Amino acid sequence: MGIQHEFDIIINGDIALRNLQLHRGDNYGCKLKIISNDYKKLKLRFVIRPDWSEIDEVKGLTVFANNYAVKVNKVDYTLYYVIYEAVIHLYNKKTEILIYSDDENELFKHYYPYISLNMISKKYKIKEENYSSPYIEHPLIPYRDYESMD
């Protein structure tokens, strides 16, 4: 069957992007397009629920916003999940965010999902699923302790 992690992103404790992992493999990531009309500070929580069947360690995450590296901090690590957090400041009307465990260009073109989040109209859309099955949960009702961003 192959290895498959679970990968979710929680944005400001209000929006959850679920199942961003690939159908198979040790990679996870996505491309986000965020539209906003004024300055916004977004707190992103990345939740990885690893499949330990074939690995000893979880790959780290890399985040770029409009081609600038974003600092990502590992905040929790258990047998059941690994949590990273990052803060992104939106200054432009349109912000492109790349989140990945492996930066191979082919993964962004054909495998990682592409999601559009319009913060003005509150319309959130999956533009391309590619080799994953993502969905958007809004408003978020945290059902796991680590999903709450208090």
Swiss-Prot record:
InterPro entries named among the record's database cross-references: Poxvirus_C7/F8A
Keywords: Early protein
Example of a GO biological process term: viral process
Pfam families documented for this protein: Pox_C7_F8A
Induction of its expression: Expressed in the early phase of the viral replicative cycle.
Domain of life: Viruses
Functional description taken from the UniProt entry: Plays a role for multiplication of the virus in different cell types.
Annotated family: Belongs to the orthopoxvirus OPG027 family.
Identification of the protein by name: Interferon antagonist OPG027
Organism: Monkeypox virus (strain Zaire-96-I-16)
Taxonomic lineage of the native organism: Viruses, Varidnaviria, Bamfordvirae, Nucleocytoviricota, Pokkesviricetes
